[in-house]
């Protein structure tokens, strides 16, 4: 799938707001993000800094692990560049506003690596297919 500026503009703030709202209910404080080109969000809870990458899924509907239609969750390999400073990688369902997430240290493991040819990009890209039971659902 190629990058769509229209889809980004439509869903980026929506996804980040859903995650922010969820974090606030869990006692996090949203803090300014110092890196415009890094992960999407930073939060603090009890003096510990957390980092959050947020993507929105508009073509897959789920409310929980049980009704998620696949056995694995596919995470983009190009986000691996941020793994030196661990982060939570989140997907937000546009229809249900449910969040699924996994920690970067869990995602970026050789056993989950898959390479696929992406027609719209004309290249092979790396993905990580993490078993859905290893993800967090909220």
Question: Where are the language model's segments positioned?
Answer:
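Charged, well-structured alpha/beta interaction segments
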Residues: 29-45
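Interdomain/boundary linker segments immediately adjacent to catalytic/signaling cores
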Residues: 1-17, 21
């Amino acid at each position: 799938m190629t990058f769509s500026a229209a889809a980004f503009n439509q869903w980026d703030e929506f996804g980040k707001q859903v995650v922010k709202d969820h974090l606030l209910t869990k006692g996090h404080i949203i803090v300014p993000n110092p890196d415009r080109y890094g992960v999407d969000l930073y939060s603090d809870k009890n003096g510990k800094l957390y980092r959050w990458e947020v993507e929105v899924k508009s073509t897959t509907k789920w409310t929980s692990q049980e009704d998620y239609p696949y056995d694995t969750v596919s995470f983009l390999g190009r986000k691996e560049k941020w793994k030196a400073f661990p982060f939570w990688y989140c997907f937000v369902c546009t229809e249900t506003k449910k969040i699924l997430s996994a920690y970067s240290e869990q995602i970026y493991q050789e056993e989950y690596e898959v390479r696929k040819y992406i027609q719209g990009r004309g290249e092979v890209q790396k993905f990580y297919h993490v078993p859905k039971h290893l993800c967090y659902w909220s």
